[in-house]
Amino acid sequence: MVHAECVWWLGIRILFVPPVSLEMHSVNVNNMSIQQQQQHQPQQQLLKPIRLANVSTQAQSLDTLHYKCQQEGPCMEQACLASVIYAGVNLKPRVRPKEELLAHAKDFLDQYFASIRRLQSPAHEARWAQVEKEVAATGTYELTETELVYGAKLAWRNAPRCIGRIQWAKLQVFDCRQVTTTSGMFEALCNHIKYSTNKGNIRSAITIFPHRTDGKHDFRIWNKQLISYAGHKSKDGTVIGDPACVEFTEICIKLGWKGKGTMFDVLPLVLSANGEDPDYFDLPPELVFEVPLSHPKYKWFSELGLKWFALPAVSGMMFDCGGLQFTAAPFNGWYMNSEIGSRNLGDTNRYNMLEKIAQKMELDTRTPVTLWKDLAMVEANVAVLHSFQLHNVTIVDHHSAAESFMKHLENEQRLRGGCPADWVWIVPPISGSATPVFFQEMANYFLYPGYIYQEDAWKCHEWKEIDVKHGLKKEKRKFHFKQIARAVKFTSKLFGSALSKRIKATILFATETGKSEMYARKLGDIFSHAFHSQVLSMEDYDMSKIEHEALLLVVASTFGNGDPPENGQGFAQSLYTIKMDENGLPNGHTNNTLASSASFIKANSQTDRQASLERCDSFRGSTGDADVFGPLSNVRFAVFALGSSAYPNFCAFGSYVDNLLGELGGERLVKLTTGDEMCGQAQACNKWAPEVFSVACDTFCLDSDETFLEATQMLHSEAVTASTVRFVESATQDLCKALSHLHNKKVWKCPLLGKRNLHGKGSTRATLLLEIERNENISYQPGDHVGVLACNRKELVEGIISHLESAIDPDKSVQLQILKENTTPDGIVRNWIPHDRLPTCSLRTMLTRFLDITTPPSPNLLQFFASCATNSEDQEKLTELATDSAAYEDWRYWKYPNLLEVLEEFPSVRVLPALLIAQLTPLQPRFYSISSAPSLYANQIHLTVAVVQYCTQDGKGPIHYGVASNYLYDVTIGDSIYLFTRSAPNFHLPKSDTAPIIMVGPGTGIAPFRGFWQHRLAQRSLNGPGKFGKMSLFFGCRLRNLDLYQEEKESMLKEGILSKVFLALSREPSIPKTYVQDLLRVECKSVYIQIVQEGGHFYVCGDCTMAEHVFRTLRQIIQDQGNMTDHQVDNFMLAMRDENRYHEDIFGITLRTAEVHNRSRESARIRMASQSQP
């Protein structure tokens, strides 16, 4: 028989039929697909929505969430049992059979994958198959860490008796499922208490120990709360202390504990692991934060000698998740004042202080009509609130708690269609009808996962050693915290670090050149000393896990003029989607192109809502305001942003990530830190890394003194030494595969078909048109890029080889190997492993194709060179450059030396080949806009490349060659070029052929536009004249004879492909200096009509400075021609981005001009100085 469930409100009983319990209707779900199992579910045709009213406001809602109820309600048809504490709950230990376990697991996994929008996905199916396999083999299974965190939060969200659930997502989960002993449990619980107490700024947390297997190896915490006061019962029946703890106090005494016999003796922790008999552990006094109670008005209140502990941590309940029963899973929130003032101190079966307080107040306690109990209770609550706030301890008053719960009900009704709530427990024990929850009808039902009552451990424990006289285990040796810590420290290094390793630190990077990855991996090494750290590229990160991260560190560079790197675009879009979901917008509303566009990121990098939390923000007052909590409210984060101040939108992507993480509720550990490529980037990271490590250790209450010293040494220590790196002979790898592995791209080998200088054979300048054979598997669209994998110059490679110490054959194929140490239960194990990125090839090939030898060495590499120098002057100079940021930047700017020039400047530096190779960074691809259209040149890819050569030291230094442009200049027809393509979706042609197009591209910025007009030509040839929108080109160069593709442009004008071509000449004699933005101003009316009135598209390609000037010019044109205010024109420009009508393809400084570099370096120095100030 299925009993009716009850909705209870002021004695009114509303019945409904619950769904069939999973326990009652277990089916064999083995070997079923998810779809088959859904068809197998019992029909729930009798279910109807529950109408719930608010008697005060007359508002009504329909609860449908109860359809998912999986447990019979406590009420009978003849009686309502809503006020019975354990009604309908089986407290006895029970092991679920496989079929029932699988049914629960199936339900939970459905909920989990639905929450991450992957219900019935291949990942869901694979996970379910894995669980089925585990259960079939072992009778149980393991939740993943992310599933566990999700389940713990959802269980709090489902708890019908909790009034503070609005903060359900802000729960720190300590995964302690690997603990096997009571001492390990005690260490974890001490960490939990320390973390959650947080010097009074209470934080919600749960610690989860191994789940039940066969019922004979349970882990249990015998205390009902982690911190509680003893109840000492005298022979006359009176109790000193807390009467609620008398029975458990006697258990502790029989185990050997001895209290002091005061009203507030803190009970020890009694713990049993793996079904063994319990041990007890005294909590160290410094771990238990107690608040002495005083009153703001009555001075005598403090004379009562009352106090209470700050942390309410429930430890006797069972966490039931996915069919797994976690019998030891203590959790905490923070106190509501009435829990202490009304219940703990006021209840007659607790401290029963109301009469004493009333007598002190000189109230007449002989008759209830004086309301002395009510008055005394109010003042007790006043004292509790006053005392907690006086000592800066988090607490919430019952009015604020009730208001927050009403907000939570509203949220849940919108998000889930209902909210389980037990009216008897939700309504505060004081001022009930003065709170809004009193008037709200509620539906009480139970959802999984959840927190469930279970039988007291001492009532069901099977003792291994029996003391016949007392019926308990013989007296145990008492364990002190210091003894445990000492034993852990000296007996097992692995176990000693296990506690900190339970806290995961996820480090994400987004990079184009590899610098962000390098800094991120160094950060990972530092955090591995105290956390379980993992380093991932943003594109490899599973965004479904972000809500459940405890610690998130981001190292992000900015690409171009504010864009994310290619491997960060998906992350940017996902963050934006979360933000839109939080704002209640439908999923289809989000614009992924907008989310990763430069203008959008620039705008969002300059805003910061007050709702985002700093670490120093306090919740010590009333915490009922839910507005500051977002979907990432449980995430602590810090961001290090890399960029170049040569670009106007400096570090825009890192700022964007920092702001969005904050706006989504994340807690910022330290303020955004930037590293400027123009000055002191490595130094900025070296300053930021130890700071964020120290703050993180403090946040998670990890002892960081000794660990901090070990970790920060990683910043200054050599990653490899002569004894930890070596070359071994090995067969050569395929070059194409090796390059693909290094760059994590599909690399193609493509022959060069043709090459010519667009300025003519006699010109002193060279801008090349390269025609490359296109592999049939390469696909691209006009506007996309090619990444060219160039070779370093032969003379550089030869020179470096001549400076190496060893006489290794540079043409023999070798493999670089690193000696790695791994700590195992058997001790430290050392193994030689291949370098994770470099291939097996010759030393010459490594220096030619795989390693960067032209970028000035970093301070870390110079410090390494100092250790290799035999001349004291070389050592001193190199050490100065490595440690003095200003000296390094001046040296770097003036000489911009390549590796060979450094070795020549410091000739006493002699380096082992393997050691040098291990220190160098990868040679990065050089990107070029494709200058052709596949619709016109089906088997070719064209590139437009300006050959870069310059002299350092104001033109008086040695000549330097651009790596890729000079490689392409030297390559001969028929030789193979290794390359890959990169999509540029924000720079593709409009979907509508009729939309006007304005193209602005001085110099080689014309490259992608050649592909545009070729595509339009092919379209017209294939489809006929048709109706095409105008296509106008604004091109600029220094002199008329440097006009690129002049004849081709004239031909396109005659063909009607190009509507107009405008030429700006900046150095032509006898005419005024003119730039492309000047011509835009001349054509302002036409530009306005095409862009604003006709909905045209605007494309800009070139260096970042030009692009910023063009953007400002277009903005001014639209404002002037449209008579717009600043606010209106800014909104219009952002709307163009939103509609993907403003397109930028931006690259950095083309030549190292003194004007640009001096300005950028000066701004970088000012920024560094400001960041170093406290």
UniProtKB/Swiss-Prot annotation:
Its cofactor is heme b; FAD; FMN. NADP(+) binds at residues 998-1016, 1095-1110. InterPro entries: CysJ-like_FAD-binding, FAD-bd_FR_type, Flavdoxin-like, Flavodoxin/NO_synth, Flavoprot_Pyr_Nucl_cyt_Rdtase, Flavoprotein-like_sf, FNR_nucleotide-bd, NADPH_Cyt_P450_Rdtase_alpha. The keyword Iron applies. It holds the Pfam family FAD_binding_1. Heme b binds at C162, Y453. FAD binds at residues 780-791, 923-933. Keywords: Calmodulin-binding, FAD, Flavoprotein, FMN, Heme, Iron, Metal-binding, NADP, Oxidoreductase. One of its GO terms (molecular function) is metal ion binding. GO terms for biological process: nitric oxide biosynthetic process. L-arginine binds at Q225, W334, Y335, E339, N344. It comes from the Eukaryota. Its EC number is 1.14.13.39. It catalyses: 2 L-arginine + 3 NADPH + 4 O2 + H(+) = 2 L-citrulline + 2 nitric oxide + 3 NADP(+) + 4 H2O. Residues 745-990 form the FAD-binding FR-type domain. Residues 475-495 are annotated as: Calmodulin-binding. Belongs to the NOS family. Produces nitric oxide (NO) which is a messenger molecule with diverse functions throughout the body. The production of NO in the salivary gland is used as a vasodilator for blood sucking. PANTHER family: NITRIC OXIDE SYNTHASE (PTHR43410:SF1), NITRIC OXIDE SYNTHASE OXYGENASE (PTHR43410). This is Nitric oxide synthase, salivary gland. It comes from Rhodnius prolixus (Triatomid bug). The lineage of its organism: Eukaryota, Metazoa, Ecdysozoa, Arthropoda, Hexapoda.
